[in-house]
Amino acid sequence: MESEDLSGRELTIDSIMNKVRDIKNKFKNEDLTDELSLNKISADTTDNSGTVNQIMMMANSPEDWLSLLLKLEKNSVPLSDALLNKLIGRYSQAIEALPPDKYGQNESFARIQVRFAELKAIQEPDDARDYFQMARANCKKFAFVHISFAQFELSQGNVKKSKQLLQEAVERGAVPLEMLEIALRNLNLQKKQLLSEEEKKTLSASMVLTAQESFSSSLGHLQNRNNSCDSRGQTTKARFLYGENMPPQDAEIGYRNSLKQTNKTKQSCPFGRVPVNLLNSPDCDVKTDDSVVPCFIKRQTSRSECRDLVVAGSKPSGNDSCELRNLKSVQNINCKEPLVSDEKSSELIITDSVTLKNKTESSLRAKLEETKEYQEPEVPESNQKQWQSKRKSACINENPVASSNQWQIPELARKVNIEKHTTFEQPVFSVSKQSPPMSASKWFDPKSICKTPSSNTLDDYMSCFRTPVVKNDFPPACQLSTPYGQPACFQQQQQQIPATPLQNLQVLASSSANECISVKGRIYSILKQIGSGGSSKVFQVLNEKKQIYAIKFVNLEEADNQTLDSYRNEIAYLNKLQQHSDKIIRLYDYEITDQYIYMVMECGNIDLNSWLKKKKSIDPWERKSYWKNMLEAVHTIHQHGIVHSDLKPANFLIVDGMLKLIDFGIANQMQPDTTSIVKDSQVGTVNYMPPEAIKDMSSSRENGKSKSKISPKSDVWSLGCILYYMTYGKTPFQHIINQISKLHAIIDPNHEIEFPDIPEKDLQDVLKCCLKRDPKQRISIPELLAHPYVQIQTHPGNQMAKGTTEEMKYVLGQLVGLNSPNSILKAAKTLYEHYSGGESHNSSSSKTFGKKREKK
């Protein structure tokens, strides 16, 4: 009897084991098929339009875009000009498809923005700064974004700017803080790399270790049959977190392509993996490495979407699985029902999803309330409020019943207010060291700090002087602040200053939070910061008469002699030149001390560089008008013996439809008896740099310093490059990526500049005359002002205007002597019939018309 029972049990066990093996083989085949299809989709580098369309139509998530872009980048080695342009185009397409206000807190989106800026730095370093600034503004919480920007500035020789970026990142509370501290230390040690490879590995290990400790302390010990850990998997995870460029196969860890899940009607979790359901796809599973890696939960702003990377124990040979039959306690999430073990590993069956009804959800909340006091570390209330304020509009689930089937296993590492939030929010990094909270600067309205950053560049000088939408009156009393402890002068007699065209506006600011600046006793209320660069900042301000101005503040505490001379020259040039031309930016007032400089200037709308980036096509008349404005402005400075030497679109500001020249910081004044000057250092922008400046850098040397010979014809070349950009949408040598090759092409007479055919032949002639490499053969500014391109065709127009005036005089003369309405009506009808017949006014028609009127 006992033998029969034993044999029956063995048969039952054998049948169960066969079923388990069948299920295992089924999952293996499904995973292999999915991986092959995923590789097939993403490995095609010739035409990815199909994959891109699928991404945009399906999830349109940063993770999918990043996976595709990294695969494209891997297959683009070695990187040629064509492949680089293609990569940049795909990155640009991804950024356009992902709104920053929605994905600003997403790490993958931050990596896309940073990598796009790095690729632009290879192709066009002059424009890369704008894209780094855009990434920094959109993804300010990630330390690797700030470090990448600082590394770029360091590579350009801007050590002070690099340090400023890192310090501001620390003040903003970017994480991880250790990374920023290491970068600052390396910068102070004058190292070329802010983060070395060894430091990256150290950061990787420390980050993973810290996260493991936090994971084990909050969720409890995860029991694994084999606790061996693949160090490569850990390092790869952490490397991915702080933005290091990795191979696509490593980058896919935790970023399972959503295209893969959409093809399945129902998925079961693979053996040995903990199921976590994404809010946007209840049936999808998360595939991980075979290593024990802690849980990193990412925050996003897309419809309460959180992507969790939950990793189970490693499997020695077979596949492990478990089943969550009942959710009885949040405190211990372990499998309590062991099944029959295999020869190599025990088998635990897990369900593919966890569904909570309203009753279960309420019990879960009660459990959480009970366990919060002794399970979770205390979080400062200020940080919790700040976290909630950032996610308030995007992470509140308004229908808990509808989303109950999308519940996720939370990481009990932070204190969560269940009454206000139904979505568990976690930081991207689990760091033991608390990051300092963001401190509001004394220069800003606190509300402006929390504002969603714009995607436009904020770093250009005089960038985007936009008139704010204003509603409230000027505050009767505002807090006066002068930087660095300088007292404001209130007792001086205020005098009238000319008003800008933007007048009688109201201020959108609170009367208590708005700060003011005092310049020579005049009080200006700060509206917002509109530009910054180096040690200077530009603010849009309002005076007591509701007039808009721009105040440029310069901190002189760390300024060297060259910087001091630069600003003094700028003030002197503006005072001198604004009296002779309205194409020069207006300087209304200024104040200079040993610690700072204030310059009250005219406030414009937008600089030419930003305007050109926004415009897809330029109206020919608009281009001609702006070209004439530029010529008149440069002609004015040349007449007073000044060569600008660094003309580019950012040096021109659009004010009420007119271009005005700004930024004389590096301009040089020529001696009266010379026709050219020699600069101590070459400072022009490469894309707009004249050939003679490049040649004389190497040929002319004095006292061990390279010299650059410039003349008024140098500004003509730069103006020609600007006009070329306005005509063809790029500079003449922008297509050359390598900077050394670009410099050689500029000075090489055998390198022909392309001038594609355009309808305006006179415009094409202007471009050819401006872009001649020999300064002696290059056209001058007076000749450009007399060129037919800038001359409106006056002769036909004058004749037409003259004829129209005569006709109008004739018509009025016929009507002026009539008194009765009937006579006026008859005369008007006769005139209408006369001109409708195509006849023009002449002496014979005048006599005929007079006879008709006499008869009538």
Curated annotation (Swiss-Prot):
Residues 524-790 form the Protein kinase domain. Inhibited by the ATP-competitive kinase inhibitor, SP600125. The active site is at D646. It catalyses: L-seryl-[protein] + ATP = O-phospho-L-seryl-[protein] + ADP + H(+); L-threonyl-[protein] + ATP = O-phospho-L-threonyl-[protein] + ADP + H(+); L-tyrosyl-[protein] + ATP = O-phospho-L-tyrosyl-[protein] + ADP + H(+). Residues 835-846 have a biased composition (Low complexity). This is Dual specificity protein kinase TTK. It comes from the Eukaryota. CDD domains: PKc_Mps1 (cd14131). The modification Phosphoserine is found at S7, S37, S80, S281, S317, S321, S363, S393, S435, S454, S820. Pfam families: Pkinase. GO terms for biological process: meiotic spindle assembly checkpoint signaling; mitotic spindle assembly checkpoint signaling; nuclear chromosome segregation; protein localization to kinetochore.
